[in-house]
């Protein structure tokens, strides 16, 4: 399925593919 973006950004990075940092939470691109 599609990645779920909701983890906390770590140093401006998101480890889930297809997600970007919208501090402090990762959002879908």
From Swiss-Prot:
Record's keyword annotation contains Ribonucleoprotein: no
Residue stretches spanning the membrane: none
Cross-link named Cyclopeptide (Gly-Asp), sites: 1-29
Family stated for the protein in its record: Belongs to the cyclotide family. Moebuis subfamily.
Reported function: Probably participates in a plant defense mechanism (Potential). Binds to and induces leakage in phospholipd membranes, particularly ones containing 1-palmitoyl-2-oleophosphatidylethanolamine (POPE). In vitro, displays cytotoxicity against cultured cells. Not active against Gram-negative bacterium E.coli ATCC 25922 or Gram-positive bacterium S.aureus ATCC 25923 up to a concentration of 64 uM.
Keyword Disulfide bond applies: yes
Disulfide links within the chain: 5-19, 9-21, 14-26
SUPFAM superfamilies: Cyclotides (SSF57038)
Pfam families cross-referenced by the UniProt entry: Cyclotide
InterPro entries: Cyclotide, Cyclotide_sf
GO BP field: defense response; killing of cells of another organism
Species this chain originates from: Melicytus latifolius
Domain remark from Swiss-Prot or TrEMBL: The presence of a 'disulfide through disulfide knot' structurally defines this protein as a knottin.
PTM comment text: This is a cyclic peptide.
Keywords: Cytolysis, Disulfide bond, Knottin, Plant defense
This protein's name: Cyclotide mela-3
